[in-house]
Amino acid sequence: PARIVDEVSVGPQLGEENIQAGFSSFVIALAVILLYMVFYYKGAGLVSNLALIANLFFLIGALASLGAALTLPGIAGIVLTIGMAVDANVLIYERIREEMRGGKGLMVAVKDGYSKAYSAIIDANLTTLLTAFVLYSFGSGAIRGFATTLIIGIFTSLFSAIVWTRLVFFSRLENKKPISFYTDMTKNWFTKINVNFI
């Protein structure tokens, strides 16, 4: 027998307006992030942006293959996925910049930057993944839609941030093509900040 697990009634006009508002906020947030990454990280920011767009294609393709409909919780999951993907790239890039400030060459700095940023990225995504599984297991309706988008997004984000960008960087370095991780303006930003939390 059929069992109703969730029921929400929204007028067609209101539902369409909500979807449009959610999509508009998604586009604005994406545009701001893309611009900021290029402004702050220059060439590496462009690589990050390409990885982010590829990540979106992977995620939307996976959702389409599952026959998922675009809902507000789904849009929220996509936006959160973008944030997590950017966070992973920022962790890697800041680690690389730190290695470069320590006097290491670009190739060594990139290798060490990725290897030393792995644990923080995996830990952050693993805890979020566990939370998403709990939401999917005990939630219903819209909550499950959000959790599904988030679970898929975590895997696509890890792939784009850890695998895709690494391949691009090492391909360029092996072909003696330069990569910049900062602009002249942002080179020394936040390097002398020392917050005494205790």
What are these regions (language model features)?
Residues 100-126, 183:
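Helix-loop junctions and hydrophobic alpha-helical segments within the transmembrane domains
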Residues 115-171:
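Hydrophobic alpha-helical segments
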Residues 159, 163-198:
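Interfacial helix-loop-helix hairpins and adjacent transmembrane helices
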